[in-house]
């Protein structure tokens, strides 16, 4: 099924690819409070991460009609998703980041783009019967202060299958 999708839509990039994913899976998104996101200029969107890759794809698809200058700070493994890699700044989560990566991160925080971050760093988990993020890392706050970027918190409502939470 994935191969069929990629054969049909593999030529799409960035938000167009995300729109196709949303259509394929028949997913609709409701945005509330979009007016709190500036229409231009630098802003950080700090989001919970309940759905893994799908929340990022859904958010790109929905937000792209409002702003086109979207970048995500992601696990560098996701740079292998060539249809989306132009939207990503990859971070090595399991080792040191090279000087070139630190430079890219600094450039992203210095730019005027919408910079999307999942501060927990991982998909939400089930704790004592409740689905929630791991503790948010504070690094993005330090960057936001130093670069004078506004931070807008974003709540994404959703959860994965019970099977996922039994695994983790």
Where are the language model's segments positioned?
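Short, flexible loop segments at the rims of nucleotide/cofactor-binding pockets, characterized by
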Residues: 7, 20-26, 91-97, 129-130
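Catalytic core of membrane glycerolipid acyltransferases/transacylases, capturing the structured
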Residues: 43-96
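A structural signal for short, well-ordered beta-strand segments and their strand-loop junctions
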Residues: 71-74, 116-118, 151-155
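A cross-family acyltransferase "interaction/gating" segment
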Residues: 127-168
């Amino acid at each position: 099924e994935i191969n069929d999708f990629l054969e049909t839509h593999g030529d799409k990039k960035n938000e167009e690819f995300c729109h196709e994913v949303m259509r394929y899976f028949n997913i609709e998104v409701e945005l509330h409070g979009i007016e709190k996101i500036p229409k231009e200029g630098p802003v950080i969107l700090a989001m919970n991460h309940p759905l893994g890759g799908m929340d990022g794809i859904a958010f790109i698809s929905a937000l792209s009609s409002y702003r086109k200058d979207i970048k995500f700070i992601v696990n560098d493994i996701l740079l292998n998703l060539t249809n989306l890699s132009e939207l990503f700044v990859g971070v090595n989560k399991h080792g040191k980041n090279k000087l070139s990566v630190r430079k890219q991160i600094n450039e992203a925080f210095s730019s005027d783009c919408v910079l999307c971050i999942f501060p927990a760093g991982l998909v939400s988990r089930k704790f004592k019967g409740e689905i929630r993020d791991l503790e948010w890392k504070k690094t993005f706050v330090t960057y936001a202060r130093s670069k004078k970027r506004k931070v807008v918190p974003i709540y994404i409502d959703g959860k994965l299958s019970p099977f996922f939470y039994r695994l983790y």
